[in-house]
A protein has these predicted regions:
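Short, solvent-exposed loop/beta-turn-alpha elements that line the ligand-binding surface or hinge
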Residues: 61, 118-133, 231-234, 302-311, ...
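Pocket-lining segment of extracytoplasmic ligand-binding domains
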Residues: 95, 184, 188-189, 194-282
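Bacterial N-terminal signal peptides that target proteins for export
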Residues: 2-14
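Conserved C-terminal helix/tail region of periplasmic/extracytoplasmic solute-binding proteins
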Residues: 318-343
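Stable alpha-helical elements in mature extracytoplasmic
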Residues: 46, 55, 74-78, 93-97, ...
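Secondary-structure end/capping motifs
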Residues: 250-325
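C-terminal segment of classical bacterial N-terminal signal peptides
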Residues: 19-30
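Short, glycine-/small- and polar/acidic-enriched structural segments
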Residues: 32-174, 178
Length: 343
């Protein structure tokens, strides 16, 4: 894993000041594209479908010119960049979006799925650890000598997450609570994904939230995966990672949003059509993550849902309320933009 490259990408995104021609995924083809857009994301394996949509010309064919792809170390700063107008669209998990919508008052619209689960595997993952390990691209890394062998063992421990009150923290808190532990006693600290495994190995933290391609780094470094908090949290929600824009941008640029939705739908469908196609999409992700082809292919393959439903937003919001991450019930209907249903 090229951690130095990830750090450079994240640092560039934090400043939101990178020339378009120097950016990953930059694409200038005005002869085909009518709409210029800037896109934010966290460089993880599942954004490979987005990169493939650039590489294959799907965006261009649908009238989109991706002028900038700006990487961020975690979803909250990318959502902040979205709100400021520094990017037009960004990748973020449902929990991070709900937190920004409910607790920060950001007017957002979820326009397309970016990654998630298939229902059959999600159901099996509840009782089959092997299925969970193969499905969830997130995990919690701990030292094999730490004495941490169950979720409740994280009670009172120091746990690293990429950002507070988003997917890592919320899903781990849920797992700890369900296992009889006290999530409120956890000392949460923030670290970038490339620093997570080293922090566990050195004893700086007791546990760390990791996501592919960093999940495999945990075991490679002689540490162990405690469990998979994503599949422990989500029950029948299939779209977990999402593409989002602001309500204002969506209202003023419906044709651009539709073209973006169409491009993402085509890339997602391509990836899910065959193993050969998925391989191409996974390899495209290395342009964003800096991982080697071997590292990317060794990680869990992403799942790309066809659409986002109200369940994908309402259920996490209800669980966040029960865990104390929301102060009052939230109707997420206003978050969901009309989904693209074509090809």
């Amino acid at each position: 894993m090229s951690k130095s490259r990830f750090k450079k990408l994240a640092a560039a995104g934090a400043g939101v000041a990178v020339a378009a021609t120097a950016l990953i995924g930059a694409n200038a083809s005005p002869a085909f594209a009518a709409y210029d857009i800037k896109v934010g994301l966290t460089p993880i394996n599942s954004v490979g479908a987005y990169q493939y949509a650039i590489d294959s010309g799907m965006f261009r064919k649908n009238g989109i010119n991706v002028t900038q792809t700006i990487p961020f170390p975690a979803p909250p700063p990318s959502i902040a960049a979205l709100a400021s107008g520094a990017v037009d669209f960004t990748y973020a998990p449902s929990i991070a979006i709900i937190n920004a919508y409910a607790n920060a008052g950001m007017a957002l619209k979820v326009i397309a799925p970016a990654d998630g689960y298939d229902m059959a595997s999600l159901i099996k993952s509840k009782t089959n650890p092997a299925v969970a390990a193969g499905l969830d691209d997130t995990g919690v890394c701990v030292s094999p000598t730490s004495g941490i062998n169950s979720w409740k063992d994280l009670t009172g421990k120091t746990v690293a997450v990429p950002a507070r009150k988003t997917q890592g923290e919320v899903t781990i808190a849920n797992a700890v609570k369900k296992d009889g532990g006290n999530a409120a006693s956890i000392n949460w600290v923030t670290l970038g994904f490339p620093q997570m495994v080293d922090a566990v190995k050195s004893g700086k933290v007791d546990a760390a939230f990791v996501v592919s391609p960093f999940t495999s780094d945990c075991t490679t470094a002689g540490q162990k995966i405690l469990g998979y908090p994503g599949v422990a949290f989500f029950t029948n929600e299939l779209a977990i990672g999402l593409w989002v824009t602001t309500a204002d941008y969506a209202a003023k640029n419906p044709a651009t949003v539709l073209a973006f939705q169409k491009s993402i739908a085509q890339a997602n469908a391509f990836a899910m059509a065959s193993k050969a196609n998925m391989r191409k999409v996974i390899l495209a992700s290395t342009k964003l993550t800096g991982s080697t082809p071997a590292e990317a292919l060794a990680a869990n393959s992403p799942v790309y849902p066809k659409t986002v439903t109200k369940i994908d937003l309402q259920n996490p919001a209800s669980k966040m309320l029960a865990l104390g991450y929301l102060t009052k019930p939230l109707d997420t209907a206003g978050l969901l933009y009309t989904q693209y249903r074509g090809r």
